[in-house]
């Protein structure tokens, strides 16, 4: 009987240790209405510009891969090595963006070459993405509206958001790319 109690306690201890290890290993940012900007976070216009520029670069650099996948892999290292501060300062949405991209190099860090540059073809910028048609029933729409109006969702954001991840917490280029 003593051996079964010891084995049960050992099993419980191992199970608890594994659960704690998994919990610590997952980084989940939570934000409340009292959250403040992280010292190294991007907020407001800088966050919007960095997001727009990164998504623009990823869609046009990898048109066959990026629009179909939300997950990211190692093929995007060149774009991911561009610092967020550079992405926040670029304005790729100007009317003369084609001339800007074809004449200027966007600086990025390469492991082999150090600071370098990349040119992107302007023909890829002409492609338009088609939005999928939304098919919703009335009950689904009511459920969405009910969730949007709930006080609980305002107080603690249950799902991660761009502002929570990149303004109230420190953000990486990889994290920002998951919102493209």
UniProtKB/Swiss-Prot annotation:
Keywords: Cleavage on pair of basic residues, Cytoplasmic vesicle, Disulfide bond, Pyrrolidone carboxylic acid, Signal. GO terms for cellular component: extracellular region; transport vesicle. Heterodimer of a B chain and an A chain linked by two disulfide bonds. SUPFAM superfamilies: Insulin-like (SSF56994). One of its GO terms (molecular function) is hormone activity. The modification Pyrrolidone carboxylic acid is found at residue 26. Belongs to the insulin family. Residues 1-25 form the signal peptide. It is found in: Cytoplasmic vesicle, Secretory vesicle. This is Molluscan insulin-related peptide 7. It comes from Lymnaea stagnalis (Great pond snail). Residues 71-152 form a propeptide. Disulfide bonds join 43-167, 55-180, 166-171. The lineage of its organism: Eukaryota, Metazoa, Spiralia, Lophotrochozoa, Mollusca. It comes from the Eukaryota. Gene3D superfamilies: Insulin-like. InterPro entries: Insulin-like (IPR016179), Insulin-like_sf (IPR036438), Insulin-rel_pep (IPR016724), Insulin_CS (IPR022353).
